[in-house]
C-alpha cells in the first residue's frame, strides 16, 4: 500500500515538473517572434543601418549553398532573407503616360474636325454640310468608337427632323 502511494506521488511530482518546464520554455520561445525593436533603414556596401542608429556588416559565405528566400519584408523596400542578409527589393513599377505619337494626334484632329462639322450641320441643315459631316464621321478611327456613335446619332436626329435643304 505504501509503495503504491509513493509511486503515485512520484508520478504526480514528475508530471507537474514536466508541465512547468514546457510552459516556461514556450514562454521564452514566444518572446522572439514579436515585433522587432531593430528595423533596417538602409543598406550601403553590405553595411546595414538600423533605426536605432547601430550598424552591422553582412556577408553570405561562399560555402553556404542553401537557397535564399524572402523571410520578411521591411519598410523602405528592404527584404530580409532566410540566411539573415538584407537586400533592397525590386523597384516599384510606375506607369508613365505614353507620349502621343503623330498618328494619335492625327486621329484626335480628325475627331475634332468631325465634331465641328456635325455641329455645323445641326445649325445649317444643308445637304453639303451633311455630306461633309458624314464623311468626317466615317473617317474617325475605331479607337473613338463611342464618340463616333454619338456623332452618328446626332446626324441621324437631324435627318429625322426632315427639313434638309
UniProtKB/Swiss-Prot annotation:
Keyword Ligase appears in the UniProt entry: no
InterPro entries named in the record: Efb_C_sf, Extracellular_fibrinogen-bd_C, Sbi_C3_db_domIV
One GO MF term: complement binding
Coiled coil stretches, renumbered: none
Subcellular location: Secreted
Cited Pfam families: efb-c
Signal peptide per UniProt: 1-29
Cellular component annotations (GO), alphabetically ordered: extracellular space
Keyword terms, alphabetized: Secreted, Signal, Virulence
Function: Extracellular fibrinogen-binding protein that plays an important role in virulence. By interacting with the alpha chain of fibrinogen and its derivative fibrin, enhances a non-functional interaction between fibrinogen and platelets and is responsible for repression of fibrinogen-dependent platelet aggregation. In addition, assembles a fibrinogen protective shield around the bacteria which results in impaired phagocytic clearance by the host.
Subunit structure: Interacts with host fibrinogen alpha chain/FGA. Interacts with host complement protein C3.
Name by which UniProt lists this protein: Fibrinogen-binding protein
Native species: Staphylococcus aureus (strain Mu50 / ATCC 700699)
